[in-house]
Every structure is written in structure tokens, then in C-alpha cells.
């Protein structure tokens, strides 16, 4: 079962929840990065938060290049989860606590995301662990949310370690268990990691990436 219907519904509920609760769209600090998501005027020199809406991509993002580079077939949901929309990261409440789902802010962000997924998959190969790819974070314990590439199930994973707990048998069922979390935008601190400079790859993931690299 594709995750796309569940993602469509969650993103639609997300901006509707902000409108009904706060009377405004969700806001995000783009840090000078343009996006089709931005509603209203955008000044690249400004450090102010912008209002945004998820936008369906005209040309769907593909991970065929990642599959070719790693000689690996990726679970099809990766193309639906990351390739259908331009959007800011989205916050959620869930049975497993609060967290954040990554999304793609613009085409450059998509390129950076692909490089980070390649890095993650290469690390899994080096550690002789089953392939996973990340979709977000749980706030408690800085734990990644990952998809098992063999069967599409969703797990909690600490970088460098085996996934520790299955959260849902599929990405669709995981997303269906989430509800939008209403919160003010947070301006993420940029860490000196060139491959992770795009704001769509959130600061908390960068901290975990440092931990992962330290275990090489």
C-alpha cells in the first residue's frame, strides 16, 4: 500500500489545523532558500519566517540515481514520501511522542537529501546492517525514524545502531497514526557540514549525523 494517500491527508490536515487553531498558515525559517511553498513575498536577505503551503511537484522527484549509485533497489515509498511535494518539515504528535517528518523545500534541498541518504545507506553497508532510510525524528532521545528497505516497515533507530523498535508495519500506517502539532517556527542553528546546509535537513538530524560519523 502506497504511503501517498496518507501523506496527502496529513499535509492537508496540517495547514488546516494551523488555520483553525491560529488563524494563519504554518511558518518556517527558509534561511534565504526560495521555494514554491512560500506564500506572499520572499526576500532572500531576510531572516524572518515565511508562511507556506505544501505544493505538488510538477516533475516528481526520483531516487533512480541513488539506486544506480549503490546498486540497490529502494522501497517504492521513498519516491512518494520525498518526490511528490515541496514542503517544510512538519511537526507531529503520535503514540510514540512528538517528532518531525522531513520534507523537501526545493530542488537543491532534494539533491542534498539524496546525498545524505546515500551517506546513510553506505554507513549501513559498512556496519553490515540491513538497509534503512530516514524519514524524520522523534524528539525524545534524538532517535531517527527510518524505513526498513526490505519490507517498508517503520522503526526507531539510533545512528550507527540496529533499529530498536518497530513502530508500524508500513509507512502509510505510521503516517495515519500521526496528528499535526501546532507550534511556532524554530530557527535552526546551522552546523558546519557542507552536505547538510539546506534548511530542509533539520538541525537535530545534523547532530545525529555527527554521532553517526563518529562511529565510522
Curated annotation (Swiss-Prot):
Pfam families found in the cross-reference section: Syd
Membrane-crossing segments per the record: none
Disulfide feature: none
Source domain of life: Bacteria
Annotated GO CC locations: cytoplasmic side of plasma membrane
InterPro entries (UniProt xref): Syd (IPR009948), Syd_sf (IPR038228)
Regions annotated as coiled coil: none
Signal peptide coordinates: none
Keywords assigned: Cell inner membrane, Cell membrane, Membrane
Localization, UniProt: Cell inner membrane
UniProt topology in membrane: Peripheral membrane protein
HAMAP family listed in its UniProt record: Syd
Described purpose of this protein according to its UniProt entry: Interacts with the SecY protein in vivo. May bind preferentially to an uncomplexed state of SecY, thus functioning either as a chelating agent for excess SecY in the cell or as a regulatory factor that negatively controls the translocase function.
Family (UniProt): Belongs to the Syd family.
Name recorded for this polypeptide: Protein Syd
Species assigned in the record: Shewanella sp. (strain ANA-3)
Gene name linked to the record: syd
